[in-house]
Structure formats: structure tokens, C-alpha cells
């Protein structure tokens, strides 16, 4: 008679008192015909996975054997003789190799997963098979971020060995990007992803820009961090609760410091512009979605302007808000930018034009007020006399006069707030 167990990340999350994102089940002692007869719908080509009426996944217990160099080159054995223990032993980390009885809620642990969860450690289940899939290096980095765990020394060395042997370069861009994107989810300790890869020298193939960033020294009068990589990681901690798009922008905002010309060091003048090409190269390599690329470039290009908001005249503030809100159409875009600006400015205790958080938030509120006033403003906003004056102009002259008119309108409205 077949038996069904809850397995993997769902069991781990329950032990961590977290709500499981997905629930996966393994069926021991069954076969395809029996599962279909019980009303399950079969999906998947390499090995049988079944969906119940609620869309939850059930997989036949299976063993696997590496038969080639590709991540798809595995032979799967999924007959009724495969045991629960054999199925769990093929998994990557001990915290993911747990099962739970459906009826009794008893947790079955063959590999010390509960111990490692308590100790907040990522440990390879079987070192000899762990190295068969180099993606596990990035999965280790991702789970370190997702769970806020540390990688135990032997597993760390296995990851280092795979990186040094050049195994990571054979991975697909889509698989690497997926792990980074998962590591950047809200409430994750996202900085641990890059910190782990830097520690084990695993950045060369997919993230070389961050090696250069780690070698970029900071000026103490701007950042107390030893180098730009450390500053970026501290800034990432500031946006721990925010979206992956915001985190990616913070991650990339100082990449231009990594290739500062030697003759202008220790200053990093122009790093905001130099960083744009580096973001393009990174996103091309990872095949990152355009929404990540576009926002990261917007923040990189404009993040130095944040530090000067307090000294800007109204026309400059108007232009900045217009640029950061898609011509006063998208307030969420502006809010995301200001969140990134806060992370950069207060990523550590640094001298700045702002004496405290309140000064920064005061200026942010001003930016939002400018948006609220200008959102929806068009020719019909103005009185007939002003419209007639504007219509006497054309081409570039019209654009200049129209902008001046809107700034005067903004100045008057700000005086009413």
C-alpha cells in the first residue's frame, strides 16, 4: 500500500514557524497507473509528477544517477521499490531533506536536518553527489539569503571547489538569474547571496562586476565602509523588506566605482554614468527582465542627485521628479527611487548633508508633493490667457516656455501647502 508524505521546503518552513510557499508531496510504493486510477493528473516528462484537484504536486519517490555533464543528464528510477529514505537522500541540503507524516505530523529526519535548522546551517546531504549539479553553489547562496542561514565549512568548501574547477560557467543564464531573483525577495537577507559568492571566489563567471566593486576603496568622508562592495551590502540590508526590483537597483547602483580610472582615484567622479554600461553587461549576461534593468539604470544614473536634493533650486527638483516618475505619471516609481536613495544615504553612519532621518524624509515628502501637484497638469490646467500665450510659441521655444509656466504654477501651489 502506498504512503504519502509532505517533503522538502514545506517541512523546513513549518519547523521554522513560517508559512510554506508551496507544498510538495512524495508518494512511496506507488506507480503511474495507480496514481492515474486515483484521479491524479500527470504532468512532467523526465519523471512522473501528479496534480490533485487543488493543484498540489505529488511525485513518485525516486532515485537519480548522473549520466552526463548537463544539469539534465540524470537517470531517474521511480518504481514502487524506491524508499522514502532513498528519495530524501538525493536532495541538496539537510534542511530540505525532511518528510512529515500526513496523519501524525511526525517529522522523519534521516540526515540531521532538524539539528541544522536549529543551528541555522546549510549542509550538503551527500558530499559525493552534491557536486553533480553546480547550480547548488547558487542555491546555497540563495538559501543563505532566504533563510538567513550560514553555510557549514565542508559544504562551503564543496562550493568553492566547483567554482575553482570552472563548473559554474556551464550553467544557463536563466537558472542563475532565477536564483538571484529568489534571493532578492522581500524579507530575505539578500546581502548574503553576494557575500557568500565573494567569500568562496565564485563571482568570476556570472558576477565579475562585484569583484571589482570589492576592490574599490571608499573615501571615509562619504562612506565608512572599507570598500564599495561592503557599502552596497549594508545598503541592501536597509531595504530588506522591499521588492526584488528595488533590491536589484541598490545592488547595482555603485558598480561604476569598480572601474574608476586610476588617475582620478580615490575619488569616483562619474561612477553613476560608468555604471550604466556595467548594468547592461550584467543584465545581458543574466538575461534579466527589462523591468529590473531599466529601474536599476534609472537609480544608478540619478542616485548622486539624491545627495544634492537639499541644495537644488525648484526647477532642478521639478526636473528630478519628472525624470523619476515617468513625466509625473507613476508615483510608485518615484517612491521606489526614494527608497533606494534612503538605502544609499543611510546604509551606514556617514557624514552627509542630512543631520538625521527627519531631514531626508522632509525632502522626500517635498518630492512627493511636487508629484501630487504636477500629476495630470496639462494645457487645460491653465487659464485662457495663459493658454493663448503658450500657443504663440512652437517647437523648442514652446517646450521651454511651457516648462517655465509649469514651474511657476508649481511654485504657487507649493506655497499653499
Language-model regions, residue ranges each:
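Catalytic cores of the polymerase beta-like nucleotidyltransferase superfamily
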Residues: 1-417
Amino acid at each position: 500500500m502506498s504512503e504519502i508524505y509532505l517533503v522538502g521546503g514545506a517541512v523546513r518552513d513549518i519547523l521554522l514557524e513560517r508559512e510554506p510557499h508551496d507544498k510538495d508531496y512524495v508518494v512511496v510504493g506507488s506507480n503511474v497507473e495507480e496514481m492515474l486510477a486515483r484521479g491524479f493528473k500527470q504532468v512532467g516528462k523526465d519523471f512522473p509528477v501528479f496534480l490533485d484537484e487543488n493543484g498540489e504536486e505529488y511525485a513518485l519517490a525516486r532515485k537519480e544517477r548522473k549520466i552526463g555533464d548537463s544539469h539534465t543528464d540524470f537517470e531517474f528510477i521511480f518504481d514502487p521499490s524506491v524508499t522514502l529514505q532513498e528519495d530524501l537522500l538525493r536532495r541538496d541540503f539537510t534542511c530540505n531533506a525532511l518528510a512529515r507524516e500526513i496523519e501524525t505530523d511526525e517529522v522523519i529526519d534521516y540526515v540531521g536536518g532538524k539539528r541544522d535548522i536549529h543551528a541555522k546551517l546549510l549542509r550538503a546531504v551527500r558530499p559525493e553527489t552534491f557536486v553533480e549539479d553546480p547550480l547548488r553553489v547558487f542555491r546555497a547562496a540563495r538559501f543563505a539569503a532566504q533563510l538567513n542561514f550560514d553555510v557549514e565549512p565542508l559544504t562551503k568548501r564543496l562550493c568553492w571547489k566547483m567554482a575553482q574547477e570552472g563548473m559554474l560557467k556551464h550553467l544557463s543564464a536563466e537558472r542563475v538569474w532565477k536564483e538571484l531573483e529568489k534571493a532578492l525577495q522581500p524579507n530575505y537577507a539578500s546581502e548574503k547571496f553576494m557575500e557568500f559568492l565573494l567569500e568562496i571566489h565564485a563571482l568570476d563567471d556570472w558576477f565579475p562586476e562585484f569583484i571589482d566593486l570589492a576592490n574599490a576603496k571608499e573615501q571615509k568622508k562619504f562612506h565608512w565602509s572599507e570598500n564599495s562592495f561592503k557599502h552596497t551590502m549594508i545598503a541592501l540590508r536597509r531595504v530588506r523588506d522591499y521588492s526584488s526590483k528595488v533590491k536589484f537597483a541598490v545592488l547595482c547602483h555603485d558598480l561604476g566605482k569598480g572601474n574608476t580610472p586610476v588617475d582620478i582615484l580615490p575619488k569616483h567622479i562619474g561612477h553613476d554614468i560608468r555604471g550604466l554600461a556595467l548594468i547592461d553587461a550584467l543584465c545581458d549576461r543574466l538575461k534579466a527582465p527589462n523591468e529590473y534593468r531599466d529601474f536599476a539604470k534609472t537609480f544608478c544614473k540619478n542616485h548622486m542627485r539624491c545627495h544634492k536634493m537639499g541644495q537644488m533650486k525648484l526647477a532642478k527638483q521639478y526636473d528630478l521628479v519628472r525624470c523619476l516618475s515617468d513625466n509625473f505619471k507613476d508615483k510608485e516609481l518615484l517612491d521606489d527611487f526614494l527608497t533606494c536613495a534612503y538605502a544609499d544615504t543611510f546604509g551606514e553612519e556617514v557624514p552627509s548633508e542630512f543631520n538625521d532621518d527627519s531631514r531626508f524624509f522632509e525632502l522626500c515628502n517635498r518630492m512627493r508633493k511636487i508629484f501630487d501637484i504636477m500629476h495630470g497638469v496639462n494645457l487645460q490646467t491653465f487659464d485662457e490667457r495663459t493658454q493663448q500665450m503658450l500657443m504663440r510659441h512652437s517647437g523648442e521655444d514652446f517646450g521651454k516656455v511651457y516648462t517655465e509656466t509649469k514651474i511657476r504654477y508649481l511654485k504657487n501651489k507649493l506655497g499653499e501647502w
